[in-house]
C-alpha cells in the first residue's frame, strides 16, 4: 500500500496517507515524527495501520533528514505546526482532531509542540530529553545535518517535565526498559506530571531503543489509545 500523495511543502518532504473517502471526515489524523537520523519512510508501517482504522496520517522528513531542505534548526517546532495544519487542510477542517506520534527525538518534539498544535492526544515513544539531545548535538553523535547554534538554542530551556505538566490532552508514553539511548527513567519522571486521567506510561520489559516503534501489538495499543482520545471508541 502506497501513500495517497508524496510532495514537498515549505521545503519539507512528506507523504500523505488517507483512509477510504467515506470515513475520512469523521476520524481525524496523525502526524508522525521520526527520530534522529531516520526518515518518513521508516514509519510507513504505522501510517498503514492508521488508515486501516480510518485515520489519516502524515509522515514527513524533518530538516536535515531525507529529502527535506536545509539543516535541522530553529524551525523544527514551526515545521511540526505547519505539517499539522497541512493535515487539517487535507481533512477539510481547520479544527480537525490531530494527534502527534513521535519516536525518540520525534517524541520530544511531539510533546514540545502539542500545545501549539492543539493536539487531541500525543503518543511519545522513548521520548528524548532536551539535555540528551543537546549532549548528542555537542559531541557530534547526532546522525543528521544540523545548524548547531539554532537547534541548540531551540533545545535550551526546553526540558519536557515542566512542559508536559501543563498539557491537558491524553498522553501515552511507551518506553523499553532496556533502552540504551534514552533511559526509561526519563519517561517515568514525565509520567509523574501527566494531567489527563486517561494518560499512562507503558514500559516494555527488556528491549532496546527501537523495540517499540515497529512492534505490531504496540502499534495497535497506540491506535486504540488514539481512537479513545478522539471519542471513536
List the predicted regions and their residue ranges:
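Hydrolase active-site cap/lid region
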Residues: 112-153, 211
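Short beta-strand/loop motif that positions the catalytic acidic residue
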Residues: 166-168, 173-175, 179
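N-terminal cap/lid segment of alpha/beta-hydrolase-fold proteins
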Residues: 1-23
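The serine-hydrolase catalytic nucleophile loop
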Residues: 36-48, 62, 185
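Short alpha-helix in the alpha/beta-hydrolase fold that links the catalytic acid
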Residues: 169, 183-192
Amino acid at each position: 500500500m502506497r501513500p495517497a500523495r508524496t510532495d514537498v511543502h515549505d521545503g519539507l518532504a512528506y507523504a500523505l496517507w488517507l483512509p477510504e473517502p467515506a470515513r475520512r471526515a469523521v476520524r481525524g489524523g496523525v502526524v508522525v515524527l521520526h527520530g534522529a537520523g531516520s526518515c518518513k519512510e521508516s514509519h510507513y508501517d504505522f501510517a498503514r495501520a492508521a488508515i486501516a482504522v480510518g485515520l489519516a496520517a502524515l509522515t514527513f522528513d524533518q530538516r536535515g533528514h531525507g529529502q527535506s531542505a536545509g539543516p535541522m534548526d530553529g524551525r523544527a517546532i514551526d515545521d511540526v505546526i505547519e505539517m499539522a495544519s497541512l493535515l487539517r487542510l487535507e481533512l477539510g477542517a481547520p479544527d480537525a482532531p490531530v494527534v502527534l506520534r513521535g519516536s525518540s527525538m520525534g517524541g520530544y518534539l511531539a510533546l514540545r509542540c502539542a500545545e501549539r498544535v492543539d493536539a487531541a492526544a500525543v503518543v511519545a515513544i522513548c521520548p528524548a530529553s532536551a539535555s540528551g539531545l543537546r549532549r548528542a548535538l555537542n559531541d557530534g553523535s547526532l546522525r543528521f545535518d544540523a545548524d548547531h547554534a539554532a537547534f541548540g538554542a531551540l533545545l535550551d530551556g526546553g526540558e519536557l517535565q515542566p512542559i508536559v505538566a501543563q498539557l491537558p490532552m491524553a498522553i501515552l508514553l511507551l518506553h523499553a526498559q532496556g533502552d540504551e539511548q534514552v533511559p526509561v527513567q526519563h519517561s517515568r519522571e514525565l509520567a509523574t506530571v501527566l494531567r489527563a486521567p486517561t494518560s499512562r506510561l507503558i514500559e516494555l520489559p527488556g528491549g532496546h531503543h527501537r523495540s517499540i516503534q515497529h512492534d505490531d501489538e504496540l502499534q495497535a495499543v497506540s491506535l486504540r489509545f488514539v481512537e479513545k482520545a478522539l471519542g471513536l471508541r
